Amino acid sequence: LDCFIEAMSGELEAVGFRTEAGFDGLHGHGVLWGGNLTVLCSLLGTPHWPRIEGGILFVEDINEHPYRVERMLLQLHQAGVLAAQKAVLLGDFGGWRKSPLDRGYTLKTMVAQLRAVCPVPILTGLPFGHVPTKVTLPVGRCVELQVLRRDVLLSWACDHDHDHD
């Protein structure tokens, strides 16, 4: 709640989180957009799809098995959505229960598979979704993404801020 109040009052200008190793030095800016992965996929191909290129896409979902998350992210990949972004930030994908049908297929495995086919950096660890402690994100604003070792900083008090239709 504090993060939301700070964001609404204009006091919050950045959020940070930790991701895996391998993205040190990543830097870019773009329009921050996204939300629930299932909802986004349901909009694909409709007039309501947000056509954003060069953005920073964030997604989350709940109660979806890794193979289903993979299917939805591959749908966005095959539609050219992921390749058109500067980066993809994965929030929380909890709430699902292991099943014998999963055969050990985990979210970590799914992320590795996606990274193998997608040319865009895919970062995990964004504290967003159905989690007790989450960040408030300025959807639709230009943000700057910086990674130093495993620390990710998303800031929106940047010089690149401008209106987007």
Describe each region flagged by the PLM:
Residues 24-25, 32, 49-51, 81-82, ...:
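Solvent-exposed alpha-helices and their adjacent loops that cap or buttress functional pockets
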Residues 92-161, 165:
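ATP/nucleoside-binding phosphotransfer catalytic cores, i.e., glycine-rich phosphate-binding loops
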